[in-house]
Amino acid sequence: MKIRNSLKSLLGRHRDNRLVRRKGRVYIINKTQKRYKARQG
């Protein structure tokens, strides 16, 4: 999992990327390409 300050640029890298909020953190998850998983931090 990548940890980035800004997720906006990562969101457009793959069409299956989804932005989700869990426990006060912002994540990008991708069911088809797991390598695009990221967390804002």
Swiss-Prot record:
| SUPFAM superfamilies attached to this UniProt entry | Ribosomal protein L36
Entry annotated with the keyword Ribonucleoprotein: yes
Top-rank taxon, per record: Bacteria
Keyword Ribonucleoprotein applies: yes
GO MF annotation terms: structural constituent of ribosome
Query: What keywords are assigned to this protein?
Result: Ribonucleoprotein, Ribosomal protein
GO BP annotations listed: translation
Q: Which GO terms describe its cellular component?
A: ribonucleoprotein complex; ribosome
Entry similarity comment: Belongs to the bacterial ribosomal protein bL36 family.
What protein name applies here? Large ribosomal subunit protein bL36
Q: Which organism is it from?
A: Xanthobacter autotrophicus (strain ATCC BAA-1158 / Py2)
In the UniProt record, what gene is named as encoding this protein?
rpmJ
